[in-house]
Protein backbone atom coordinates (compact mmCIF):
# COMPACT_ATOMS: atom_id res chain seq x y z
CA UNK A 1 0.00 0.00 0.00
CA UNK A 2 1.61 3.29 -1.08
CA UNK A 3 1.87 6.32 1.20
CA UNK A 4 -0.63 8.25 -0.93
CA UNK A 5 -3.07 5.32 -0.90
CA UNK A 6 -2.84 5.15 2.90
CA UNK A 7 -3.45 8.89 3.20
CA UNK A 8 -6.47 8.72 0.90
CA UNK A 9 -7.85 5.75 2.82
CA UNK A 10 -7.40 7.44 6.19
CA UNK A 11 -9.01 10.65 4.95
CA UNK A 12 -12.01 8.73 3.60
CA UNK A 13 -12.45 6.57 6.70
CA UNK A 14 -12.07 9.54 9.06
CA UNK A 15 -14.77 11.51 7.25
CA UNK A 16 -16.97 8.41 7.23
CA UNK A 17 -16.49 8.05 10.99
CA UNK A 18 -17.73 11.58 11.58
CA UNK A 19 -20.72 10.85 9.33
CA UNK A 20 -21.43 7.69 11.34
CA UNK A 21 -21.52 9.75 14.54
CA UNK A 22 -24.13 12.01 12.93
CA UNK A 23 -26.19 9.02 11.71
CA UNK A 24 -26.12 7.45 15.17
CA UNK A 25 -27.25 10.67 16.88
CA UNK A 26 -30.03 11.15 14.31
CA UNK A 27 -31.26 7.58 14.87
CA UNK A 28 -31.34 8.01 18.65
CA UNK A 29 -33.16 11.34 18.19
CA UNK A 30 -35.77 9.77 15.90
CA UNK A 31 -36.32 6.86 18.30
CA UNK A 32 -36.92 9.17 21.28
CA UNK A 33 -39.16 11.87 19.80
CA UNK A 34 -42.62 11.92 18.20
CA UNK A 35 -40.80 10.88 15.00
CA UNK A 36 -40.40 7.35 16.38
CA UNK A 37 -43.56 6.04 14.67
CA UNK A 38 -42.27 7.33 11.33
CA UNK A 39 -38.78 5.90 11.96
CA UNK A 40 -40.06 2.44 12.93
CA UNK A 41 -42.71 2.37 10.21
CA UNK A 42 -40.19 3.32 7.54
CA UNK A 43 -37.79 0.54 8.53
CA UNK A 44 -40.59 -2.05 8.63
CA UNK A 45 -41.93 -1.13 5.17
CA UNK A 46 -41.90 -4.29 3.05
CA UNK A 47 -40.26 -4.34 -0.36
CA UNK A 48 -40.63 -7.16 -2.88
CA UNK A 49 -38.42 -8.14 -5.81
CA UNK A 50 -39.51 -10.75 -8.36
CA UNK A 51 -37.26 -12.85 -10.62
CA UNK A 52 -39.75 -14.94 -12.59
CA UNK A 53 -41.09 -17.49 -10.09
CA UNK A 54 -38.63 -16.33 -7.41
CA UNK A 55 -39.91 -13.71 -4.98
CA UNK A 56 -37.94 -11.90 -2.27
CA UNK A 57 -40.06 -9.97 0.25
CA UNK A 58 -38.39 -8.33 3.25
CA UNK A 59 -38.77 -5.25 5.47
CA UNK A 60 -36.46 -2.38 4.54
CA UNK A 61 -34.37 -3.05 7.67
CA UNK A 62 -33.52 -6.56 6.45
CA UNK A 63 -32.77 -5.34 2.91
CA UNK A 64 -30.22 -3.04 4.53
CA UNK A 65 -28.75 -5.73 6.81
CA UNK A 66 -28.74 -8.55 4.24
CA UNK A 67 -28.28 -6.60 1.00
CA UNK A 68 -26.31 -3.41 1.55
CA UNK A 69 -24.07 -5.07 4.14
CA UNK A 70 -23.19 -7.75 1.57
CA UNK A 71 -21.65 -4.93 -0.48
CA UNK A 72 -19.78 -3.79 2.64
CA UNK A 73 -18.37 -7.30 3.11
CA UNK A 74 -17.49 -7.38 -0.59
CA UNK A 75 -15.27 -4.35 0.05
CA UNK A 76 -13.84 -5.95 3.20
CA UNK A 77 -13.05 -9.10 1.22
CA UNK A 78 -11.32 -7.08 -1.52
CA UNK A 79 -9.17 -5.32 1.09
CA UNK A 80 -8.30 -8.58 2.85
CA UNK A 81 -7.33 -10.32 -0.42
CA UNK A 82 -5.15 -7.40 -1.55
CA UNK A 83 -3.42 -7.15 1.83
CA UNK A 84 -2.76 -10.92 1.92
CA UNK A 85 -1.25 -10.96 -1.57
CA UNK A 86 0.65 -7.66 -1.61
CA UNK A 87 0.15 -5.64 1.57
CA UNK A 88 0.50 -5.61 5.34
CA UNK A 89 -0.68 -9.23 5.70
CA UNK A 90 1.78 -10.66 3.17
CA UNK A 91 4.65 -11.44 5.56
CA UNK A 92 4.95 -12.79 9.10
CA UNK A 93 6.94 -9.87 10.61
CA UNK A 94 4.32 -7.39 9.37
CA UNK A 95 1.36 -9.41 10.60
CA UNK A 96 2.80 -10.58 13.96
CA UNK A 97 1.77 -7.75 16.32
CA UNK A 98 -1.58 -6.93 14.64
CA UNK A 99 -2.37 -10.66 14.63
CA UNK A 100 -1.55 -11.06 18.33
CA UNK A 101 -3.52 -7.90 19.16
CA UNK A 102 -6.51 -9.04 17.10
CA UNK A 103 -6.65 -12.39 18.91
CA UNK A 104 -6.55 -10.69 22.31
CA UNK A 105 -9.02 -8.04 21.18
CA UNK A 106 -11.58 -10.68 20.18
CA UNK A 107 -10.94 -13.33 22.84
CA UNK A 108 -11.03 -11.22 26.04
CA UNK A 109 -14.25 -9.29 25.21
CA UNK A 110 -15.96 -12.60 24.35
CA UNK A 111 -14.83 -14.12 27.66
CA UNK A 112 -16.04 -11.09 29.66
CA UNK A 113 -19.43 -11.17 27.92
CA UNK A 114 -19.73 -14.92 28.47
CA UNK A 115 -18.87 -14.59 32.16
CA UNK A 116 -21.49 -11.88 32.72
CA UNK A 117 -24.20 -13.72 30.72
CA UNK A 118 -23.38 -17.24 31.91
CA UNK A 119 -26.64 -17.49 33.88
CA UNK A 120 -28.71 -16.04 31.00
CA UNK A 121 -28.86 -18.75 28.27
CA UNK A 122 -31.08 -16.63 26.01
CA UNK A 123 -28.35 -14.03 25.55
CA UNK A 124 -25.26 -16.23 25.89
CA UNK A 125 -25.07 -16.71 22.11
CA UNK A 126 -24.29 -12.99 21.73
CA UNK A 127 -20.70 -13.57 22.91
CA UNK A 128 -19.24 -12.25 19.61
CA UNK A 129 -21.00 -8.85 19.79
CA UNK A 130 -18.20 -7.05 21.72
CA UNK A 131 -15.45 -8.75 19.67
CA UNK A 132 -15.84 -6.32 16.73
CA UNK A 133 -14.24 -2.94 15.93
CA UNK A 134 -15.70 -0.13 13.83
CA UNK A 135 -12.63 1.15 11.97
CA UNK A 136 -14.43 4.12 10.40
CA UNK A 137 -15.71 5.34 13.77
CA UNK A 138 -12.29 4.87 15.42
CA UNK A 139 -10.53 6.81 12.66
CA UNK A 140 -13.20 9.49 12.90
CA UNK A 141 -12.22 10.03 16.54
CA UNK A 142 -8.52 10.03 15.60
CA UNK A 143 -9.28 12.67 12.95
CA UNK A 144 -10.36 15.02 15.75
CA UNK A 145 -6.74 14.97 17.00
CA UNK A 146 -5.43 16.31 13.70
CA UNK A 147 -2.07 15.36 12.22
CA UNK A 148 -0.30 14.76 15.54
CA UNK A 149 -1.15 11.05 15.74
CA UNK A 150 1.84 8.99 14.46
CA UNK A 151 1.35 7.54 10.98
CA UNK A 152 2.63 4.05 11.99
CA UNK A 153 -0.05 3.92 14.70
CA UNK A 154 -2.80 4.64 12.16
CA UNK A 155 -1.40 1.99 9.82
CA UNK A 156 -1.31 -0.50 12.70
CA UNK A 157 -4.95 0.29 13.46
CA UNK A 158 -5.87 -0.33 9.81
CA UNK A 159 -4.09 -3.70 9.78
CA UNK A 160 -5.67 -4.69 13.10
CA UNK A 161 -9.10 -3.71 11.75
CA UNK A 162 -8.63 -5.85 8.63
CA UNK A 163 -7.76 -8.88 10.79
CA UNK A 164 -10.69 -8.03 13.07
CA UNK A 165 -13.04 -8.00 10.07
CA UNK A 166 -11.60 -11.32 8.91
CA UNK A 167 -12.31 -12.74 12.36
CA UNK A 168 -15.88 -11.43 12.19
CA UNK A 169 -16.38 -13.14 8.82
CA UNK A 170 -15.21 -16.48 10.25
CA UNK A 171 -17.43 -16.07 13.34
CA UNK A 172 -20.52 -15.33 11.23
CA UNK A 173 -19.83 -18.31 8.96
CA UNK A 174 -19.22 -20.78 11.79
CA UNK A 175 -21.58 -19.71 14.57
CA UNK A 176 -24.46 -17.67 13.16
CA UNK A 177 -25.81 -19.88 10.40
CA UNK A 178 -29.46 -21.02 10.45
CA UNK A 179 -30.99 -24.29 9.19
CA UNK A 180 -29.50 -25.08 5.81
CA UNK A 181 -31.22 -25.64 2.45
CA UNK A 182 -29.24 -28.27 0.53
CA UNK A 183 -30.57 -27.21 -2.89
CA UNK A 184 -29.68 -23.56 -2.31
CA UNK A 185 -26.20 -24.55 -1.10
CA UNK A 186 -25.63 -26.69 -4.21
CA UNK A 187 -26.65 -23.78 -6.45
CA UNK A 188 -24.39 -21.50 -4.42
CA UNK A 189 -21.46 -23.89 -4.94
CA UNK A 190 -22.13 -23.87 -8.69
CA UNK A 191 -22.03 -20.05 -8.62
CA UNK A 192 -18.76 -20.12 -6.64
CA UNK A 193 -17.24 -22.54 -9.16
CA UNK A 194 -18.32 -20.24 -11.98
CA UNK A 195 -16.71 -17.23 -10.30
CA UNK A 196 -13.36 -18.95 -9.88
CA UNK A 197 -13.48 -20.26 -13.46
CA UNK A 198 -13.84 -16.62 -14.55
CA UNK A 199 -10.84 -15.78 -12.37
CA UNK A 200 -8.63 -18.61 -13.65
CA UNK A 201 -9.46 -17.91 -17.30
CA UNK A 202 -8.48 -14.25 -16.92
CA UNK A 203 -11.93 -12.69 -17.45
CA UNK A 204 -11.81 -8.98 -16.51
CA UNK A 205 -15.35 -7.87 -17.43
CA UNK A 206 -16.91 -6.79 -14.13
CA UNK A 207 -20.46 -7.49 -15.40
CA UNK A 208 -19.75 -11.24 -15.52
CA UNK A 209 -18.66 -11.26 -11.87
CA UNK A 210 -21.59 -9.06 -10.79
CA UNK A 211 -24.21 -11.28 -12.45
CA UNK A 212 -22.81 -14.45 -10.87
CA UNK A 213 -22.35 -12.56 -7.59
CA UNK A 214 -26.03 -11.54 -7.48
CA UNK A 215 -27.07 -15.13 -8.22
CA UNK A 216 -24.72 -16.31 -5.45
CA UNK A 217 -26.22 -13.77 -3.00
CA UNK A 218 -29.76 -15.02 -3.71
CA UNK A 219 -28.70 -18.66 -3.26
CA UNK A 220 -26.87 -17.92 -0.01
CA UNK A 221 -29.83 -15.85 1.25
CA UNK A 222 -32.14 -18.82 0.65
CA UNK A 223 -29.65 -21.38 2.02
CA UNK A 224 -29.65 -20.33 5.68
CA UNK A 225 -26.05 -19.06 5.60
CA UNK A 226 -25.96 -15.31 6.16
CA UNK A 227 -26.16 -13.54 2.81
CA UNK A 228 -23.33 -11.10 3.56
CA UNK A 229 -20.83 -13.95 3.18
CA UNK A 230 -21.63 -13.99 -0.54
CA UNK A 231 -19.85 -10.63 -0.74
CA UNK A 232 -16.69 -12.12 0.76
CA UNK A 233 -16.69 -15.08 -1.65
CA UNK A 234 -17.23 -12.76 -4.62
CA UNK A 235 -14.33 -10.58 -3.45
CA UNK A 236 -11.90 -13.51 -3.34
CA UNK A 237 -12.84 -14.40 -6.92
CA UNK A 238 -12.06 -10.91 -8.27
CA UNK A 239 -8.60 -10.97 -9.95
CA UNK A 240 -5.90 -8.72 -8.48
CA UNK A 241 -2.94 -9.22 -10.80
CA UNK A 242 -4.79 -9.85 -14.09
CA UNK A 243 -5.04 -6.52 -15.92
CA UNK A 244 -7.93 -5.34 -18.08
CA UNK A 245 -7.48 -3.86 -21.57
CA UNK A 246 -6.59 -0.49 -20.02
CA UNK A 247 -3.87 -2.06 -17.84
CA UNK A 248 -5.83 -1.73 -14.58
CA UNK A 249 -6.27 -4.31 -11.82
CA UNK A 250 -9.97 -5.22 -11.61
CA UNK A 251 -9.76 -5.71 -7.84
CA UNK A 252 -8.09 -2.34 -7.23
CA UNK A 253 -10.54 -0.59 -9.57
CA UNK A 254 -13.57 -2.14 -7.86
CA UNK A 255 -12.16 -1.40 -4.40
CA UNK A 256 -11.51 2.23 -5.34
CA UNK A 257 -15.03 2.54 -6.81
CA UNK A 258 -16.85 0.95 -3.87
CA UNK A 259 -14.99 2.65 -1.05
CA UNK A 260 -16.73 6.06 -1.10
CA UNK A 261 -20.15 4.44 -1.63
CA UNK A 262 -19.62 2.22 1.41
CA UNK A 263 -18.03 4.92 3.57
CA UNK A 264 -20.49 7.71 2.79
CA UNK A 265 -23.61 5.68 1.98
CA UNK A 266 -23.93 2.10 3.15
CA UNK A 267 -22.37 2.38 6.63
CA UNK A 268 -24.23 5.60 7.61
CA UNK A 269 -27.51 4.07 6.34
CA UNK A 270 -26.83 0.92 8.36
CA UNK A 271 -25.99 2.99 11.45
CA UNK A 272 -29.17 5.05 11.09
CA UNK A 273 -31.30 1.92 10.65
CA UNK A 274 -29.82 -0.01 13.59
CA UNK A 275 -28.78 2.54 16.24
CA UNK A 276 -32.25 3.87 17.07
CA UNK A 277 -32.61 2.67 20.65
CA UNK A 278 -35.53 4.06 22.65
CA UNK A 279 -34.42 5.38 26.03
CA UNK A 280 -37.99 5.67 27.32
CA UNK A 281 -38.43 3.74 30.55
CA UNK A 282 -34.76 2.75 30.80
CA UNK A 283 -33.60 2.89 34.40
CA UNK A 284 -30.15 2.78 35.94
CA UNK A 285 -30.66 -0.89 36.81
CA UNK A 286 -31.44 -1.76 33.17
CA UNK A 287 -27.88 -0.80 32.22
CA UNK A 288 -26.60 -3.47 34.61
CA UNK A 289 -28.70 -6.31 33.23
CA UNK A 290 -26.50 -9.06 31.75
CA UNK A 291 -26.93 -8.28 28.03
CA UNK A 292 -26.06 -4.54 27.90
CA UNK A 293 -23.51 -4.87 30.71
CA UNK A 294 -21.74 -7.77 28.99
CA UNK A 295 -21.54 -5.89 25.70
CA UNK A 296 -20.43 -2.58 27.24
CA UNK A 297 -17.85 -4.22 29.52
CA UNK A 298 -16.56 -6.39 26.69
CA UNK A 299 -16.08 -3.40 24.41
CA UNK A 300 -14.68 -0.94 26.93
CA UNK A 301 -12.70 -3.19 29.28
CA UNK A 302 -12.14 -6.33 27.25
CA UNK A 303 -10.91 -4.72 24.04
CA UNK A 304 -8.20 -2.57 25.60
CA UNK A 305 -7.13 -5.26 28.06
CA UNK A 306 -6.94 -7.96 25.38
CA UNK A 307 -5.07 -5.84 22.84
CA UNK A 308 -2.58 -4.27 25.27
CA UNK A 309 -1.82 -7.36 27.38
CA UNK A 310 -1.51 -9.77 24.44
CA UNK A 311 0.67 -7.25 22.58
CA UNK A 312 2.85 -6.62 25.65
CA UNK A 313 3.41 -10.37 26.05
CA UNK A 314 4.23 -10.68 22.34
CA UNK A 315 6.76 -7.84 22.53
CA UNK A 316 8.36 -9.19 25.72
CA UNK A 317 8.70 -12.64 24.16
CA UNK A 318 10.24 -10.97 21.08
CA UNK A 319 7.51 -12.39 18.86
CA UNK A 320 6.72 -8.87 17.65
CA UNK A 321 7.64 -5.23 18.21
CA UNK A 322 5.75 -1.96 18.59
CA UNK A 323 5.24 0.20 15.48
CA UNK A 324 8.26 2.44 14.91
CA UNK A 325 8.22 5.56 17.08
CA UNK A 326 5.01 4.61 18.93
CA UNK A 327 4.95 4.72 22.75
CA UNK A 328 2.97 2.37 24.97
CA UNK A 329 0.80 5.33 26.02
CA UNK A 330 -0.16 6.02 22.40
CA UNK A 331 -0.67 2.30 21.81
CA UNK A 332 -2.99 2.10 24.83
CA UNK A 333 -5.05 5.03 23.55
CA UNK A 334 -5.43 3.29 20.19
CA UNK A 335 -6.42 0.04 21.94
CA UNK A 336 -9.19 1.82 23.84
CA UNK A 337 -10.53 3.25 20.57
CA UNK A 338 -10.79 -0.33 19.26
CA UNK A 339 -13.61 -0.74 21.79
CA UNK A 340 -15.81 1.31 19.44
CA UNK A 341 -17.76 -1.64 18.09
CA UNK A 342 -20.75 0.31 16.78
CA UNK A 343 -21.74 -0.82 13.24
CA UNK A 344 -20.02 -4.23 13.35
CA UNK A 345 -21.29 -4.98 16.88
CA UNK A 346 -24.81 -3.88 15.94
CA UNK A 347 -24.65 -6.11 12.88
CA UNK A 348 -23.52 -9.19 14.81
CA UNK A 349 -26.26 -8.48 17.39
CA UNK A 350 -28.90 -8.75 14.64
CA UNK A 351 -27.56 -12.23 13.82
CA UNK A 352 -26.87 -13.55 17.31
CA UNK A 353 -29.96 -12.62 19.32
CA UNK A 354 -33.69 -13.29 19.04
CA UNK A 355 -35.75 -10.75 17.13
CA UNK A 356 -37.69 -9.26 20.06
CA UNK A 357 -37.71 -5.48 20.39
CA UNK A 358 -36.73 -5.65 24.07
CA UNK A 359 -33.63 -7.74 23.33
CA UNK A 360 -32.68 -5.56 20.36
CA UNK A 361 -32.95 -2.38 22.44
CA UNK A 362 -30.87 -3.88 25.26
CA UNK A 363 -28.15 -4.91 22.79
CA UNK A 364 -28.17 -1.47 21.15
CA UNK A 365 -27.90 0.17 24.57
CA UNK A 366 -24.85 -1.94 25.43
CA UNK A 367 -23.18 -1.25 22.07
CA UNK A 368 -23.81 2.50 22.32
CA UNK A 369 -22.58 2.72 25.93
CA UNK A 370 -19.47 0.63 25.32
CA UNK A 371 -18.64 2.47 22.11
CA UNK A 372 -19.24 5.89 23.68
CA UNK A 373 -17.04 5.14 26.71
CA UNK A 374 -14.32 3.80 24.41
CA UNK A 375 -14.51 6.84 22.13
CA UNK A 376 -14.31 9.40 24.95
CA UNK A 377 -11.63 7.57 26.95
CA UNK A 378 -9.57 6.69 23.88
CA UNK A 379 -9.69 10.28 22.66
CA UNK A 380 -8.52 11.56 26.06
CA UNK A 381 -5.71 9.00 26.45
CA UNK A 382 -4.43 9.42 22.91
CA UNK A 383 -4.60 13.21 23.13
CA UNK A 384 -2.59 13.13 26.38
CA UNK A 385 0.00 10.75 24.89
CA UNK A 386 0.33 12.86 21.74
CA UNK A 387 0.76 16.01 23.84
CA UNK A 388 3.58 14.32 25.78
CA UNK A 389 5.24 13.47 22.45
CA UNK A 390 5.01 17.12 21.39
CA UNK A 391 6.49 18.33 24.69
CA UNK A 392 9.41 15.90 24.38
CA UNK A 393 10.06 17.12 20.85
CA UNK A 394 10.12 20.75 22.02
CA UNK A 395 12.41 20.08 24.99
CA UNK A 396 16.00 21.35 24.52
From Swiss-Prot:
One of its GO terms (cellular component) is plasma membrane. One of its GO terms (molecular function) is sodium:proton antiporter activity. InterPro entries: Na/H_antiporter_dom_sf, NhaA. It is a multi-pass membrane protein. Gene3D superfamilies: Na+/H+ antiporter like domain. Keywords: Antiport, Cell inner membrane, Cell membrane, Ion transport, Membrane, Sodium, Sodium transport, Transmembrane, Transmembrane helix, Transport. The keyword NADP does not apply. It is found in: Cell inner membrane. The chain crosses the membrane at residues 18-38, 60-80, 95-115, 126-146, 155-175, 178-198, 201-221, 262-282, 295-315, 333-353, 362-382. GO terms for biological process: regulation of pH. The keyword Transport applies. It comes from the Bacteria. It catalyses: Na(+)(in) + 2 H(+)(out) = Na(+)(out) + 2 H(+)(in). Na(+)/H(+) antiporter that extrudes sodium in exchange for external protons. Belongs to the NhaA Na(+)/H(+) (TC 2.A.33) antiporter family. HAMAP family: NhaA. This is Na(+)/H(+) antiporter NhaA 1. The gene is nhaA1.
Amino acid sequence: MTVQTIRDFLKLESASGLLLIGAMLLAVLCANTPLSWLYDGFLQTRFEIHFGALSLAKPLLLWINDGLMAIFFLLVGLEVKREILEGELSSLPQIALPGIAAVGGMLVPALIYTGINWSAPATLQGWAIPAATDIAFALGVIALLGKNVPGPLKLFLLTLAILDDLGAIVIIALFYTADLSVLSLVLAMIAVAGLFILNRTGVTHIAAYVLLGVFLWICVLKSGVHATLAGVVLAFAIPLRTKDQDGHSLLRHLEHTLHPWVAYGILPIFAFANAGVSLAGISFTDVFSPLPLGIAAGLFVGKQFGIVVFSWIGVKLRMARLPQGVSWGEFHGMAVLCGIGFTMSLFIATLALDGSQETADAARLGVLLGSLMSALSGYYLLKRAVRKRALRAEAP
